[in-house]
């Protein structure tokens, strides 16, 4: 029998604000170009995706505002905390993303960074539409209503 490779023991870095600030339409997985100290920092969960977004420049995609803390044992060879990092995508994927961003006014947002097969760092990019303030309020009201219903059901089941 063929053994499956174990999944990574590392939990992914997730951009929790992305779902709140954007209406996410489609997702795409991309590789990322990193230095050795950046990979080691990510294994220690020292990254921050909160304000990260992707830009397309000259047919290449770059991840901006992705903060990776300097590696504690990096010494002189450490990396800068915030810098544009190149994403690895096929040309057709880049062209498709570029069309969506130009035509529909959509935004490329980084939603997740994770290790695939415990070896390669991957970034999940979402194509999203920015939400307006009233959309955010509506989402919060729906979420609160769902929580109230769940609490009511839980308390009614408790006394039966």
From Swiss-Prot:
Major place of residence: cytoplasm
Single GO BP term: trans-translation
Pfam families: SmpB
UniProt keyword annotations, A-Z: Cytoplasm, RNA-binding
Cell location: Cytoplasm
InterPro entries: SmpB (IPR023620), SsrA-bd_prot (IPR000037), SsrA-bd_prot_CS (IPR020081)
Disulfide bonds: none
GO molecular function, one term: RNA binding
Coiled coil: none
GO cellular component: cytosol
Origin: domain of life: Bacteria
Family to which this protein belongs: Belongs to the SmpB family.
Job description of the protein: Required for rescue of stalled ribosomes mediated by trans-translation. Binds to transfer-messenger RNA (tmRNA), required for stable association of tmRNA with ribosomes. tmRNA and SmpB together mimic tRNA shape, replacing the anticodon stem-loop with SmpB. tmRNA is encoded by the ssrA gene; the 2 termini fold to resemble tRNA(Ala) and it encodes a 'tag peptide', a short internal open reading frame. During trans-translation Ala-aminoacylated tmRNA acts like a tRNA, entering the A-site of stalled ribosomes, displacing the stalled mRNA.
PANTHER family: SSRA-BINDING PROTEIN, TMRNA-BINDING COMPONENT OF TRANS-TRANSLATION TAGGING COMPLEX
Protein's name in the database: SsrA-binding protein
